[in-house]
Amino acid sequence: MAEKLNFDLVSPERLLFSGQVDMVVIPGSEGDMGIMAGHAPVMSTLRPGIIEVENEGAPRQRIFVRGGFAEVTPAGLTVLAEFTVPLADLDATALDREIALADKDVADAKNDDKRQSALEKLDHLKELRHTV
């Protein structure tokens, strides 16, 4: 039996998931990353996207995150997410609200760096909207 990964998914409101899994795919700022037990330590910011939790014998869990941070240590993976919702619960209306918030962030950006970051977030949300 393969070694399991300790995985914690935390939002500002609560601990959403804590357990041992086979693999987690996270939407890192530089691209998607598959994390398994024994992965090298790494920290990454998260872009809006889908976290996929894989566990042998169980359906794949897919969770939308609006951003946050991920840390891989020898103890496991911890994701601190700004906002999360299971993909099964995500509907077009909710995603449209997220897009509107991101659009406002673009308009309110105080400098070019913040505007670029907000535009990237908006682009990712629009891509996700096409999948719903």
UniProtKB/Swiss-Prot annotation:
Where in or outside the cell it occurs: the entry states: Cell inner membrane
Fetch the Gene3D superfamilies from UniProt: F0F1 ATP synthase delta/epsilon subunit, N-terminal (2.60.15.10)
Q: Which lineage is the organism of this entry classified under, starting from the top rank?
A: Bacteria, Pseudomonadati, Pseudomonadota, Alphaproteobacteria, Hyphomicrobiales
UniProt-listed CDD domains: F1-ATPase_delta (cd12152)
Q: What does this protein do?
A: Produces ATP from ADP in the presence of a proton gradient across the membrane.
Q: What is the superkingdom listed in this entry's lineage?
A: Bacteria
* Assigned protein family: Belongs to the ATPase epsilon chain family.
Q: What is this protein called?
A: ATP synthase epsilon chain
Assigned GO CC terms: plasma membrane; proton-transporting ATP synthase complex
